[in-house]
């Protein structure tokens, strides 16, 4: 039986922490769908189409990873993708409570959907998309924290 997992997120922008998680998840599961959420309430810097295109470029070297944009409820998206696992990154203990609530709600909505939590490699444990945007807006150097295509797009946007 093959296992298909979904790694969902807004990925605005995708960071090396995200890349670390999806790369390790790709070794654990047969197929990974990197699911880029529309998330209009978060007022993303990049459009859904731009985020999908950037993610595709960043994970092109991972043959078992597909990138798909979505705006549906995550559990419904998982059903449509015939996936039974959600991969989520946990940077700190502070992330756990919220992630646990999400996992329980997703399990309630789709009883065959399990959540697997991966901690990023230590050098990425403090990175977040919002932090990268904030630091970059104020002239800080975030190049080492972002995949090259994402860094280029972020610099061009600012």
UniProtKB/Swiss-Prot annotation:
Binding site for substrate: 10, 42, 74, 88
GO terms for MF: ATP binding; pantetheine-phosphate adenylyltransferase activity
Catalytic activity: (R)-4'-phosphopantetheine + ATP + H(+) = 3'-dephospho-CoA + diphosphate
Marked site positions, Transition state stabilizer: 18
Protein's pathway: Cofactor biosynthesis; coenzyme A biosynthesis; CoA from (R)-pantothenate: step 4/5
UniProt keyword terms in alphabetical order: ATP-binding, Coenzyme A biosynthesis, Cytoplasm, Magnesium, Nucleotide-binding, Nucleotidyltransferase, Transferase
GO biological process, one term: coenzyme A biosynthetic process
UniProt KW Calcium keyword: no
Primary enzyme class: transferase
GO cellular component: cytoplasm
Location of this chain's protein in the cell: Cytoplasm
The organism's place on the tree of life at top rank: Bacteria
Protein residues bound to ATP: 10-11, 18, 89-91, 99, 124-130
Self-association and partners: Homohexamer.
Protein function: Reversibly transfers an adenylyl group from ATP to 4'-phosphopantetheine, yielding dephospho-CoA (dPCoA) and pyrophosphate.
Family: Belongs to the bacterial CoaD family.
Stated name of the protein: Phosphopantetheine adenylyltransferase
Species of origin: Erwinia tasmaniensis (strain DSM 17950 / CFBP 7177 / CIP 109463 / NCPPB 4357 / Et1/99)
Gene: coaD
